[in-house]
Amino acid sequence: CECFEHNPYYKETIQNATRMLKSGGMFLFTCATTGRPVHGTKSLEEEGKRKFSNWKTMPNVIKENWDNEYYKNLTENDIRECLDFDNEFETYHFEIEENHHDLFFWGIKK
């Protein structure tokens, strides 16, 4: 999964994904974190097209009646507030990829 920064219900999504994960299953995701420029909002796409002749919109962003302007770079603390990771996962790890400002997570469910 690489989209939680666009999901206003990321907490509920993480809780539900963890709930549905079988014991021994792996939960793996990345998301934008501090330092990543806002991307993938309709207004930003329109602005980019006006400012840059070489602007390319990813196909998944082109949708009729798309009005999602929600965007939030997520931190490890934001994710940790979603659930008790020590209670849910046998082992897990957070890592930040500094070049692209991505937060990585993997965990094995108890």
Per-segment meaning from a language model:
Residues C1-P8:
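A short SAM/SAH-binding and catalytic strip from SAM-dependent methyltransferases
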Residues P8-K22, M26-K110:
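S-adenosyl-L-methionine-dependent methyltransferase catalytic module, highlighting the catalytic core
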